[in-house]
Amino acid sequence: MSLDTKKAQMRIMKVIEQVQLSDLINVADIGAASINETPVYSDLVMGGYGHLFAFDGDSRQIPALRKLYGDHATVLNHFLADGDPHTAYICREDTGMTSLLKPNQTALAFFNNFSLFGKVLKEERIQTTRLDDIDEIGDLHFVKMDVQGSELNILKNGLKKLSNCVAVQLEVSFICLYENQPGFGEIDMWMRSIGFAPHRFLDIKRWSITPTINGNNFRRPFNQLLEADIVYVRDPLNMKKRTSGQLKMLAFMSEAFFDSPDLTIHYLRELVSRKS
């Protein structure tokens, strides 16, 4: 274990003690293939303070996930959606573009190199599974999702498993790269309708527009928005509906995952008022 890893896990332990969190946090990462990112929950799971349910429908990603997390995760090779058969559009493994939605060629061509990233190698008829029908998992407390346009479909078919979920991290699109893909506005309205409020953007991705390239690097953007990772939390204006256990989880995540000390204190003040 590296020194940085030890420090990170000591910080996790300290925050758990500060908020007096006693419950194990169940995390679901749907579309869990690690494409150039370290998830916010990584130190929690690797330290043994939570359990990860890692989903990926692309079987090419499963061995790497099992190697990465070992006994800290239950790795499940499912395409989550509405439980019906769908066509999977299989793209190159390293692009993370494989989807249950057909790539929109006009949208791909708008951005430099995305026609290559979104090139479909083959189409495969697959059976999807509803999140609510996964017997291996119980209640989820934090959900991260990056599933190339299927986020809303999965959420709508997982409301039972999400009934005690306190925070959700979603990839949302400003320019939709797939046909019939819900955009940011549609997802935001639905999340609000089930009692979540937007808290912060963890990352906002911009991309250069074809054919203009910035500094001879097609990955260096100008200003065009492409997509973002947004965090939603249970409505912080309506804490009376939350149990003390849920508030402790929210306080922990706000500090350890989202780097939001003001939100942490907001929840802690409510807990103090309850003498919890």
Predicted regions and their residues:
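Phosphate/nucleotide-binding beta-alpha loop and adjacent structural elements of enzyme active sites
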Residues: 1-276
